[in-house]
């Protein structure tokens, strides 16, 4: 497994995006998915590295997917909708760079746990609306 760090622009903010990729893909490129996994923490705590340690590694190892974990702006730094806008910017970047990252841009899964699950739901609605 390889880990990369990228930075994404989001409404004047620079957010970190951790990307984990398998050493070798278990499936053909057109079948390989990308997963945007959003960390929890009550919108006020937590970091992308939390995902790296737990869920992201498991997803990469078990399913051979590429996982991106955005370090969205926490609520004590800037209120809603900063976090969901950061996740949206991360999603756009992730899709635009799918070829470089080794997955099919038409096969993106968005998920999260706790507050990340709430951001996931808000992000899906935002993406549909835009």
Predicted regions and their residues:
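Short beta-strand element of the alpha/beta-hydrolase
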Residues: 29-41
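Short amphipathic alpha-helix adjacent to the substrate-entry channel of hydrolases
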Residues: 49-70
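N-terminal cap/lid segment of alpha/beta-hydrolase-fold proteins
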Residues: 1-30
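Conserved catalytic-core motifs of eukaryotic protein kinase domains, centered on the activation segment
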Residues: 47-49, 79-80
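Helix-loop module immediately N-terminal to the HCX5R catalytic loop
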Residues: 84-88
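Short beta-to-alpha linker loops that shape the active-site pocket of alpha/beta-hydrolase fold enzymes
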Residues: 23, 71-75
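Primarily recognizes the serine-hydrolase "nucleophile elbow" in alpha/beta-hydrolase
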Residues: 89-101, 105-130
């Amino acid at each position: 497994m390889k880990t990369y760090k990228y930075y994404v622009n989001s409404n004047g903010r620079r957010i970190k995006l951790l990307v984990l990729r398998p050493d070798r893909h278990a499936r053909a490129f057109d079948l390989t998915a990308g997963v945007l996994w959003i960390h929890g923490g009550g919108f006020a705590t937590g970091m992308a590295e939390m995902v790296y340690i737990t869920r992201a590694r498991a997803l990469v190892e078990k399913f051979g997917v590429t996982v991106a974990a955005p370090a969205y702006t926490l609520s004590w730094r800037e209120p809603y909708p900063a976090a969901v806008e950061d996740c949206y910017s991360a999603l756009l970047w992730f899709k635009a760079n799918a070829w470089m990252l080794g997955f099919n841009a038409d096969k993106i899964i968005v998920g999260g746990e706790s507050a990340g699950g709430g951001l996931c739901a808000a992000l899906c609605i935002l993406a549909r609306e835009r």
